Amino acid sequence: MELATESIEGVLLVDKPQGRTSFSLIRSLVRLIGVKKIGHAGTLDPFATGVMVMLIGRKFTRLSDIMLFEDKEYAAVAHLGTTTDTYDCDGKIVGRSKKVPTMDEVLTCTSYFQGEIQQVPPMFSAKKVQGKKLYEYARQGLSIERRFATVTVNLRLVKYEYPRLHFVVQCSKGTYIRSIAHELGNMLGCGAYLEELRRLRSGSFSIDQCIDGNLLDEPGFDVSPYLRDANGLILQPAPVL
């Protein structure tokens, strides 16, 4: 049965495909269901994949500020030996190094990222300074003084095969995984950038609860069986066949 547009509301968990912007997914959802009041609980860069919490309807978009403050978990790959201006794979290469860190060095440096740490937001970020986003300054070739922010992280090394360092990190709001990759490169003395990023969890919502984001581009796709409440419960369970 087709739902009336105004009755479509809830939390939709989407696995963002690589190469898509967060806002392009929102636009696809608006076209699909005809509801304009759609928010989110945290964007992802185009190269990143994983959990996007989409909030449909006024009742749920009001939860955006609360959900933005929830912890998140990521699987990431840092590429050692190369530095970029954006700290990620979309940036311009600004440095190279032939140093190959040892496993002992990697273990020592990754152990730093436990508990509260001080982190400076990257210049290519949406963080505002003096009413202007940092990336706007960066695109003008300017580097602005930025304040340290205290964030909480729990980093676990998964695998190290030079030049790639695989890790999983649980972190608080405002943590830049790009900056962690960049800082690891500095600590190891070889430079690094973030090559891959996948959000595994946002608050209590996990990747195994998500639908493929490409489905939002399929005309007539019915999102109603996948809508959840704020606690993650399915609002309209699919019928048992």
From Swiss-Prot:
Domain of life: Bacteria
GO biological process per UniProt: mRNA pseudouridine synthesis; tRNA modification; tRNA pseudouridine synthesis
GO molecular function: pseudouridine synthase activity; RNA binding; tRNA pseudouridine(55) synthase activity
Alphabetically ordered keywords of this record: Isomerase, tRNA processing
Record carries keyword Lipoprotein: no
Disulphide-bonded residues: none
SUPFAM superfamilies: Pseudouridine synthase
Residues at the catalytic site: D45
Enzyme class: isomerase
Role played: Responsible for synthesis of pseudouridine from uracil-55 in the psi GC loop of transfer RNAs.
Name of the featured protein: tRNA pseudouridine synthase B
Annotated source species: Chlamydia trachomatis serovar D (strain ATCC VR-885 / DSM 19411 / UW-3/Cx)
Lineage: Bacteria, Pseudomonadati, Chlamydiota, Chlamydiia, Chlamydiales
Name of encoding gene: truB
